[in-house]
């Protein structure tokens, strides 16, 4: 986020997630990728500097979400879409492409809208792989 005039919540969000051990990313109000932290880079197999900012459709195509068969799924009713549309936190589970080898893994995702009075600045999203042993239990 090198633009001269970044909204304060996005600057604060970037400062917060930079130090998190939990994989996290920031988006703009349209869901475009603005930044992800080192923990996310480790899971994705690429640094933010290698990936850069991406429109929502492009980063969804590269990283997911995908269904159980690996087909892309619409993002509108997943946590990020819900958080941006409804202005409230949202959580869900789906598959994403992790690591440079293209492996699809199930992740748990929480999305928090970044709101100012009368407008959205974007969203903060945290995610983590679902442990395979845990996914088989009830």
Task: List each language-model region with its residue ranges.
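Terminal output helix/cap of sensory domains in signal transduction proteins
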Residues: 12, 51-96
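Sensory helix hotspots in PAS and closely related PAS-like folds
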Residues: 41-42
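Beta-strand residues that line the small-molecule/cofactor-binding core
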Residues: 75, 104-106, 122
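PAS-family sensory domains
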Residues: 79, 108-112, 126
């Amino acid at each position: 986020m090198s633009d001269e005039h970044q909204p304060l919540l996005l600057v604060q969000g970037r400062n917060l997630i930079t130090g998190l051990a939990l994989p996290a990313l920031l988006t703009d109000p349209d869901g475009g990728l603005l930044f992800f932290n080192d923990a996310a880079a480790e899971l994705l197999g690429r640094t933010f500097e290698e990936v850069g900012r991406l429109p929502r459709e492009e980063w969804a195509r590269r990283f997911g979400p995908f269904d159980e068969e690996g087909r892309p799924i619409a993002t509108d009713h997943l946590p990020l879409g819900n958080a941006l549309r409804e202005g409230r936190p949202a959580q869900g589970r789906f598959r994403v492409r992790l690591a440079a080898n293209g492996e699809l893994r199930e992740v748990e995702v929480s999305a928090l809208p970044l709101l100012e009075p009368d407008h959205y600045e974007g969203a903060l999203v945290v995610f983590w792989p679902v442990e395979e042993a845990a996914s088989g239990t009830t």
